[in-house]
């Protein structure tokens, strides 16, 4: 199914123009999400300027509405699932307990997935849509989150869900104002997977569990064993972070 291109009328206060966007529909489902065009420019890597090409990036974190289709095989008919006629290595096992931790589901950010899960979701999404979806690099993520500004938000609570205002849970995506390039929740809510030059992943931006000094464009966390401390499996799950409810992601689409 070909995505429908639209120009969004919703954008950050102070933005000069509404962002160029397209709506990506998931074939054979009602699920959809919006991507925004990010202009080419320069980002920072190890203190040095590096070029960033123009690309599309999710306006919000990936929500359960979309993630469920892949993670819980809702695009497969029951007979296919029962007979095991699918690549089980490319789909998650069931998590222990509620995947959404009881925070909320429809319209809420998917959370608690490993970087491997996020990568394989992007592969599935690419196959479903005939586009090239992937995780952003750390440079791309920060460049898009900053949206042309070097300064941190004047009032963090106006744009981010974090320790002081989140009530120890995630919130539906898109409830805070977007940045100048039309992106919501780049800071707070869930910290977002992004790739380092060596191919490993970190989470960026801070999350609902973090206090103000840990939420920002340069905030990074490296995966740690504590993120799976209560996982009863040996070895630990390749799919889920039993103690990482603060981890989510958004996707990038290359032209």
Label every PLM stretch briefly:
Residues 14-17, 115, 177-179, 196-255:
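Disulfide-stabilized, aromatic/cysteine-rich ligand-recognition loop
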Residues 55, 106-109, 173-174, 178, ...:
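Active-site rim elements
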Residues 160-187:
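Short, well-ordered junction/capping motifs at the entry into regular secondary structure
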Residues 36-37, 111-112, 134-136, 172, ...:
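Structural recognition of the beta-strand scaffold that forms the well-ordered cores
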Residues 16-27:
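N-terminal low-complexity, Pro/Thr/Ser-rich intrinsically disordered segments
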Residues 31-42:
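Mature N-terminal segment immediately following signal peptide/propeptide cleavage
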Residues 2-9:
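Bacterial N-terminal signal peptides
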Residues 51-155, 197, 253-255:
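Active-site microenvironments of metalloenzymes and redox enzymes
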